[in-house]
Amino acid sequence: MTDSVSKAVARTIRAPHGSELHCANWLIEAAYRMIQNNLDPDVAERPEDLVVYGGIGKAARNWACFEQILRSLQALQPEETLLVQSGKPVGVFRTHADAPRVLIANSNLVPHWATWDHFHELDKAGLMMYGQMTAGSWIYIGAQGIVQGTFETFVEAGRKHYNGDLTGKWILTAGLGGMGGAQPLAGVLAGACVLAVECQESRIDFRLRTRYLDHKAFSVDEALAIIDKACKEKRAISVGLLGNAAEILPELVQRAKAGGMKPDIVTDQTSAHDPINGYLPAGWDLARWESSRQSDPKAVEKAARASMAVHVQAMLDFCHMGIPTVDYGNNIRQVALDEGVKNAFDFPGFVPAYIRPLFCEGKGPFRWVALSGDPEDIYKTDAKLKALFPEHTNLHRWLDMAQERIAFQGLPARICWLGLGERHLAGLAFNEMVRNGELKAPVVIGRDHLDCGSVASPNRETEAMMDGSDAVSDWPLLNALLNTAGGATWVSLHHGGGVGMGFSQHAGVVIVADGTAEADARLSRVLWNDPATGVMRHADAGYEVARDCARRHELTLPMAKELP
């Protein structure tokens, strides 16, 4: 199908709600609803193009593939598995009831050819799509999906640099897309003010509409005045500043050097991983960018990469002023390094700076979705988690804040960070709630690919591993294989998410709590094994926190005694 025909059949997509099945059982129905939920206009960034988030992260290769995926799921039997290759349904095979109902591989290229240039050739020929992380694995839940991880990062930054108190402090960042859009709310929940630069006004308006952002500003002076007033009044607020980060950040550096306001933390979540589709070059307007991406993508890439170098240099300038500065995983430092900024890696990534100790205990982004479409199902599961983990005061605080501040996008969903020994208990509790009728329909449980054992990304999740194993990608492959063997409902293997082609490999997992005894067994296996692979991976790398965790949970790690 050509692009023109594909766009012609585009329509508004929303997942079915309620208890009526459109597929053979709830395991298949879950996939049927979740791919559609990914393209809900309240969820996706550009649903008319099948783009969910992250530049060009898509749910299906084209509209013909999307429609065929839905038809294939409706015809799928409980002992069959659908195979999806880069957003295209390519086969249905007989397996067994405990096998995944869908297996997905997105954007995977042989390493020598794992470049954006080669990917774009294949994409143009209709042979591949970019799945990002949760876009092509059908478990994106809107900006909430990254809020708590960003919140935990900002809280840890406050703990490390400001005695645990971000009151009166402000965070400077950029990017208000599907991932970056979480930053304003996360920062405010952590107690800080946030100034986020964004070049597309529609994205600022989207975050205002979904209550992730408090104010919009059209000039640096206006934005700084709002931030300054709030900081002095000890109020946490967020401002979206319409502008280009490669222009605004250098200006803020010059103002700071001249005695003006200085941020207290600096980071970035622009879509710098994709120089053609994700980053507006300095001096360009949106119309020129849009047309040039089609007519002269190489010129766009060249200009964008040069702008990223300027952007990173400004971040370095702040870093050298003593301001905590951190890369938030979009590979912008790598681009700047390639463009001649030799000290681009002088500031760290957020995982080694703040998050790795959590990974060592198998902690990561546990998310669930109410297939009923009823928000009350989520509120009931919130209460269940509080009862299940009464000692987790931070979890209780998060769930309270989430209920108060986070607007649902599409099917009601929740995310919280849980670790090894906790995720399976949550899954079993949800399954019991479905079984006894407390919930109106089954619950889908998944996670981001950004997790403790499911990703190899040397410039992000696995940056600066203590044993030097940053680029070893056996670990996410093992994670996917184990989750398949354990009985996950669908499993995905992707390449390039977050940081772009050639820089990451990662795996996703989704499992359904449908109230059956069979689901109890699958949930027990998958939601134990999945975080356990993260503990295993970090223990193998030499992290004592992970080794202690492995011992506490009696993991069988055959070489543990021989580890240095």
Curated annotation (Swiss-Prot):
Coiled-coil regions listed in the entry:
none
Pfam families (UniProt xref): Urocanase, Urocanase_C, Urocanase_N
Q: Give me the residues that bind NAD(+), please.
A: 54-55, 132, 178-180, 198, 203, 244-245, 269-273, 279-280, 328, 498
Enzyme nomenclature, EC number: 4.2.1.49
Q: Where is the active site?
A: C416
* Record GO terms (molecular function): urocanate hydratase activity
- Record protein name field: Urocanate hydratase
What species is this protein from? Trifolium repens
Q: What is the lineage of its organism?
A: Eukaryota, Viridiplantae, Streptophyta, Embryophyta, Tracheophyta
